Amino acid sequence: MKEFWQTCVSRLEQELPPQQISAWIRPLVPLAYDEAQAVLRVAAPNRFKLDWVRKNFSHQIEALAAEWYQRPVQVTFELPGTSSAPRIPMAVPRPVAVSVPAVVAAVQQASEPAPPAPASADAANIVYERSRLNTDLTFENFVTGKANQLARAAALQVAENPGTSYNPLFLYGGVGLGKTHLIHAIGNAMVAAGTGVRVRYVHADQYVSDVVKAYQRKAFDDFKRYYHSLDLLLIDDIQFFSGKNRTQEEFFYAFEAMVAQRKQIIITSDTYPKELSGIDSRLISRFDSGLTVAIEPPELEMRVAILLRKAESEGVPMPEEVAFFIAKHLRSNVRELEGALRKVLAYARFHGRDVLTVDVCKEALKDLLSVSNGQITVENIQKTVADFYKIKVADMYSKRRPANIALPRQVAMYLAKELTQKSLPEIGDLFGGRDHTTVLHAVRKISDARAKQAELNHTLHVLEQTLKG
């Protein structure tokens, strides 16, 4: 039984996304296999997970069990301690090789996120039924501070009144600031409310893939039927729609259909809607019609709170001075903080350090600290701005002048003048040998634009906070 379950989980790991494995498969506990009746009993930790697994994964598990036990097997799901039947001794099956093609076919039937060949509404629903929500991302474990309190308040309002308050809700900000956490929290809150809502979380890249496969299989009717029937659609990183005209067209139709039915749409992006490049103006107009909220890099107190909460979830006591030390030196985003904490915990375990101290942190993070302790340099500004605008650092020095390069270059020159002691000629030299008058023009242009354009002012604020901490 143990050997079978390990094989079952291993096989599902090859076919399902990691978040589905951690959210739905790993919490399951195999109880017993009744060899006489060919019944496999499996326990789920709560009613919500039980119903979800029974609906979405039972046939995969049955297919794997049938291959293993070499006979049709019925899988029953129950809550711990609810069965009046005695525990059945685990039969020791004859280990056999699991037939990969049969299992893969069964798993793909339920896990393939793209539309199948057109058949019926039921066939489309089998493919699309799963929400792909990460149940670990909730409002309860979302750390709130000045940087994200408005976004969290808006998210709570949407979760309580979907389709009526702020539709669409557009969240934007840099990498690792909690946008994905918030939209999963909204979905989980709506599912937990028990209203039977149809929810779908999808990264923009996956949506593009769905459109391509629907086009290849001539399955757009099934595709539209599914997406237009949702109660809540969560689209992550919509900037990846850039230049994908067919995808944008299909999303526009889905957007219009859902909003007309007062169904909720939530979108995340790394930039303000009007700054999205390669996106149809009709979509940008729709994005602006709802509520747009920025999430900024966390301030010091929030970074400390994030570290303390994460350490608590790992079951590791962390003195506040240790959290403060890490937060003081690592400033950019939540993901960086969590990565640093994992590094500290791994270092402490490897070296047998039972208590976390500042000295342990200094040793574990010496490579990161050597970088973060340095003064702000023009080179650091160029890299940070290039990363933000998704261009190459080399574009900062090049003679090319397209708009998608000229603006970031001028922003970097402006920040170099504001945040370093370099003279205009020195800054010009570091930007490919440009004349000091070019730098002065860029500084004046960005300074004037900042006073007039809220979006640019926000971008500069984020970049300054990232660079200064």
From Swiss-Prot:
UniProt keywords, alphabetically: ATP-binding, Cytoplasm, DNA replication, DNA-binding, Lipid-binding, Nucleotide-binding
Record carries keyword Coiled coil: no
Cell compartments where the protein resides: Cytoplasm
Region annotation (Domain II) ranges: 71-131
UniProt-listed InterPro entries: AAA+_ATPase, Chromosome_initiator_DnaA, Chromosome_initiator_DnaA-like, Chromosome_initiator_DnaA_CS, DnaA_C, DnaA_dom, DnaA_N_dom, DnaA_N_sf
Recorded GO MF terms: ATP binding; ATP hydrolysis activity; DNA replication origin binding; lipid binding
Region (Domain III, AAA+ region): 132-348
GO cellular component: cytoplasm; plasma membrane
Cysteines paired by S-S bonds: none
Binding site for ATP: G176, G178, K179, T180
One GO biological process term: DNA replication initiation
Entry's free-text remark on domains: Domain I is involved in oligomerization and binding regulators, domain II is flexibile and of varying length in different bacteria, domain III forms the AAA+ region, while domain IV binds dsDNA.
Physiological role: Plays an essential role in the initiation and regulation of chromosomal replication. ATP-DnaA binds to the origin of replication (oriC) to initiate formation of the DNA replication initiation complex once per cell cycle. Binds the DnaA box (a 9 base pair repeat at the origin) and separates the double-stranded (ds)DNA. Forms a right-handed helical filament on oriC DNA; dsDNA binds to the exterior of the filament while single-stranded (ss)DNA is stabiized in the filament's interior.
PANTHER family in UniProt: CHROMOSOMAL REPLICATION INITIATOR PROTEIN DNAA
Subunit structure: Oligomerizes as a right-handed, spiral filament on DNA at oriC.
Family membership: Belongs to the DnaA family.
Protein name in the entry: Chromosomal replication initiator protein DnaA
Organism whose genome encodes this protein: Bordetella pertussis (strain Tohama I / ATCC BAA-589 / NCTC 13251)
Name of the gene this protein is made from: dnaA
